[in-house]
Amino acid sequence: MSDGDILRSTFPSYMAEGERLYLCGEFTKAIQSFTNALHLQSGDKNCLVARSKCYLKMGDLEKSLNDAEASLRNDPTFCKGILQKAETLYTMGDFEFALVFYHRGYKLRPDREFKVGIQKAQEAINNSVGSPSSIKLENKGDLSFLSKQAESKKAQQKHLPIKQLSYSTKHEIKRKGSLKSEKTVRQLLGELYVDKEYLEKLLLDEDLIKGTIKSGLTVEDLIMTGINYLDTRSNFWRQQKPIYARERDRKLMQEKWLRDRKRSPSQTAHYILKSLEDIDMLLTSGSADGSLQKAEKVLKKVLEWNQEEVPNKDELVGNLYSCIGNAQIELGQMVAALQSHRKDLEIAKEHDLPDAKSRALDNIGRVFARVGKFQQAIDTWEEKIPLAKTTLEKTWLFHEIGRCYLELDQAWQAQSYGEKSQQYAEEEGDLEWQLNASVLVAQAQVKLRDFESAVNNFEKALERAKLVHNNEAQQAIISALDDANKGIIEELKKTNYREILREKAERQDIMSQMDLQGASEKEPLRGREEQERVVKQWERDQESEREATDDEQDRKSSGGLSKKLLGDGHSSNLGIRRESREIYRRLSDYSSHLPSEDGSQKQEKKQAEAAKGEVQKLEKTKEE
């Protein structure tokens, strides 16, 4: 990879791209993306685990194991790395070593993945005990995991008295063991029995067992830890029984053939049972292509047989179609997988096989959900509801239906099914499903903007996550809780903002009304003030005229003017008074005809100016 390629993107971008390609089944491209990410951030344990998963899907088991071990190099307690190493070892056929790491991870964090891993590893070991040649266990002679286990428990084992861990001879070890014979021990341990013998021989070397290792433990303590572990595992494997339904179904099928034919299983029956085991083993080990080819080959042969040779031929054919469909899902052949599972469903309906019908509906719903057709998945799974028998099955079913409704943004239905799943999970007492159901309900309530209820359910989910020690779920829930709380704050802000806007609008309306009322009251007031000012000016002018007239009359009387002139002067004075009265009358009319509350101030101004003009005119006339 060139420097230019490295700089073109970032570590999170390559990680996201790799995860998307992994989900799409493009494992080669996903590996390249994860490799690019590791160039940017060397040794990132999450990236190494992600690339290991891709190698495992492609069947490159050595590279898958190398990446898983590399993820544990700096942090031996990294649970994802432990789980991935266990899965890789299981796929490689090292069931005992896989079981060791499943148990180690379960002690660190009791998650469902480790629990299921323990169960399937136990079943694989039990299935191999009957015929050890069916599974080849690789005897690497590497007991380093025992020393690591001892070192990790230094605080607990360091101060234990050696007498509690020691046995004097090889014969005492055998007497203390719970197994009845060496033959049984050899059969249960398989090729690990060689390691047990080797450890027992080491105990005979007195000089060796007195030595100590860096952690402070003696070699004898370390050897006895390994022997005790193998003894415990032997008892455990001997007592355990197969748990998966497929094993029970195969045995029930064999018993049915025995009842129908009333004779020992024929070569045909052995062939079918062995073939079903091989098909299932190939699929679980990551070889979906091999599983598909095997199932198609067996189906072709079974279809050639008659009903007498295989009494439950129809049930077997449906089972094979189901196996073919499951392999096609893993290969990404969704259309073909849907056809195969529908054939399984048709056979189940035709021959009234409720368990087979439930299985087919389950698988058809899975196909629809994988391709994003959530409504069809809902319809299919809702048809399966009456066939669900156990509380745990109902819990899972309602959760998946609710998840599909959530994907369709139908939050009410998602909440309803989530609450049903929550109820059945509580009845079952399964903390993992209580966690899943609570998260589903909370997510639906967030979409419904019921943030308060969502916070309550997220808090409930957080409690369950703490109880099952799921740190990743805790972090995700805490983040979702923060978002829900922010949603509550935003809702409060929006509510307050709407209240503020409404109050502001109301205040503006009130102020506008007050302004209009004040303006209307001021307009006539201005008119009256102007009128009074003009009238007062006119009265002052009249007073001046009267004084001037009186002075003139006095002068004329003293000057011996004629009566005619006196009469003319009086007439002139009367004329002036008439004009004054006319002006006063016009002013009175003006006062009575003042504009109403909605009149304009400009018009009042013009009328006042006109009145002033009349007064000035009168003054000029008087002077003349």
UniProtKB/Swiss-Prot annotation:
Biological process (GO), any one: cerebrospinal fluid circulation
Annotated region described as Disordered, given as residue ranges: 511-624
Traits of the deletion mutant: Heterozygous intercrosses reveal deviation from the Mendelian distribution, with only 6 homozygous out of 53 born mice, suggesting increased death in utero. Most surviving homozygous mice present with small body size, some with hydrocephalus at the age of 2 weeks. They display a variety of left-right body asymmetry defects, including reversal of lung lobation or dextrocardia. At the cell level, the trachea and fallopian tubes of mutant animals show absence of outer dynein arms from the ciliary axonemes, and consequently severe reduction of cilia beating.
Keyword rRNA-binding: no
SUPFAM superfamilies: TPR-like
Keyword hit for Repeat: yes
Biased composition (Basic and acidic residues): 520-557, 576-588, 595-624
PROSITE patterns assigned: TPR (PS50005), TPR_REGION (PS50293)
Key words, A-Z: Cell projection, Cytoplasm, Cytoskeleton, Repeat, TPR repeat
Residue stretches of each TPR repeat: 11-44, 46-78, 79-112, 273-309, 318-351, 358-391, 395-428, 435-468
GO CC field: 9+0 motile cilium; 9+2 motile cilium; axoneme; extracellular region; outer dynein arm docking complex
Compartment list: Cell projection, Cilium; Cytoplasm, Cytoskeleton, Cilium axoneme
Highest taxon above the source species: Eukaryota
SMART domains in the record: TPR
Pfam families to which the protein is assigned, alphabetical: TPR_8
Listed InterPro entries: ODAD4, TPR-like_helical_dom_sf, TPR_rpt
Function comment: Component of the outer dynein arm-docking complex (ODA-DC) that mediates outer dynein arms (ODA) binding onto the doublet microtubule. Plays an essential role for the assembly of ODA-DC and for the docking of ODA in ciliary axoneme.
Assembly notes: Component of the outer dynein arm-docking complex along with ODAD1, ODAD2, and ODAD3. Interacts with ODAD1; this interaction may facilitate the recruitment and/or attachment of outer dynein arm docking complex proteins, including ODAD1, ODAD3 and ODAD2, to ciliary axonemes. Interacts with components of the IFT complex A, including IFT140, TTC21B/IFT139 and WDR19/IFT144, and the IFT complex B, including IFT46, IFT52 and IFT57. Interacts with CFAP53.
UniProt name for this protein: Outer dynein arm-docking complex subunit 4
Gene source species: Mus musculus
Gene: Odad4
